Amino acid sequence: MLQYQIDRIEHQVEEDRSQSGVFLIGPLERGQATTLGNALRRVLMGGLEGSAVTAIRIAGVNHEYATVPGVREDVLDILLNCKELSVNSRSPELEIGRLVVAGPAEVTAKDLQFSSQVEVVDGNRSIATVADGYSLELEVHVERGVGYRPVDRHSEDTSAIDLLQIDAVFMPVIRVNFTIDETAVAEGGSARERLRMEIVTDGSITPDDALAQSANYLIELFQPLATVTLVEEPGIEPEPSAEAQIPLEELNLSVRAYNCLKRAQVNSVSDLMGFSYEDLLEIKNFGSKSADEVIEALERIGISIPQSRTSA
């Protein structure tokens, strides 16, 4: 297997604190770049844990179609602005941020007061505009999760009339693109590839960490396959043949032979198939004549038994 290296050739932090990074991965065998690129992209875009605003509460508001006195934006606009906040929570529990701002003022994300477990990535993100003589009191709920979580209208969490739920987008990676370049090889060598991958995040995670977390996710996903243990299914016992199910009475044996076999708990051909000729001779009052009679009766229906136990 080829030993490849990973180089980050670009890294930028935008005004809104989003980050982008470009990575070169190679050299790779033909086809491996596509395998890596597709797998990493799927995890980066939907498999990483992130933080998002999941609900807000506005003082004096009990539904999303209301307006707030003295606030330029209606409640739907405030909901959308809060949904777009980039936050990074290090707590597995629900975190709540609060603000009370008196106008005139432009309310931004940096006005929210959270515990030390939550970082507001872009503090300049606008939330609302409050006019002179009015104020805005706002509560923002932040949680961690994976992927996209729509509002569950039937959940107990939505029962509070003044708690406005938000469809949560927990994905910290905004965009992933990759291209594949062929690299020069020595004469006679096989073709090599190089994967060029661009990762753009919302700033709550660096592109480097996003790539590393995706790789670890895939390692954990595939690791059990390396030690898979095959469990053999128990064998299915074959059903006895029709001949084996023939009752002892239908063999038309002599009364002496029949009675001796019955006393030995032999009731069908299936029971006789567990005997050898020597075993028959050991049955009480069962002589060679009776044993020969049984052998002949079995042969008539196409069944034979061994002469001795060792040949069974």
Curated annotation (Swiss-Prot):
It comes from the Bacteria. SMART domains: RPOLD. Residues 1-229 are annotated as: Alpha N-terminal domain (alpha-NTD). GO terms for biological process: DNA-templated transcription. Residues 246-312 are annotated as: Alpha C-terminal domain (alpha-CTD). Belongs to the RNA polymerase alpha chain family. CDD domains: RNAP_alpha_NTD. GO terms for molecular function: DNA binding; DNA-directed RNA polymerase activity; protein dimerization activity. In cyanobacteria the RNAP catalytic core is composed of 2 alpha, 1 beta, 1 beta', 1 gamma and 1 omega subunit. When a sigma factor is associated with the core the holoenzyme is formed, which can initiate transcription. Keywords: DNA-directed RNA polymerase, Nucleotidyltransferase, Transcription, Transferase. The keyword Cell membrane does not apply. It comes from Parasynechococcus marenigrum (strain WH8102). DNA-dependent RNA polymerase catalyzes the transcription of DNA into RNA using the four ribonucleoside triphosphates as substrates. The N-terminal domain is essential for RNAP assembly and basal transcription, whereas the C-terminal domain is involved in interaction with transcriptional regulators and with upstream promoter elements. It catalyses: RNA(n) + a ribonucleoside 5'-triphosphate = RNA(n+1) + diphosphate. This is DNA-directed RNA polymerase subunit alpha. The gene is rpoA. Pfam families: RNA_pol_A_bac, RNA_pol_A_CTD, RNA_pol_L. SUPFAM superfamilies: C-terminal domain of RNA polymerase alpha subunit, Insert subdomain of RNA polymerase alpha subunit, RBP11-like subunits of RNA polymerase. GO terms for cellular component: cytoplasm; DNA-directed RNA polymerase complex.
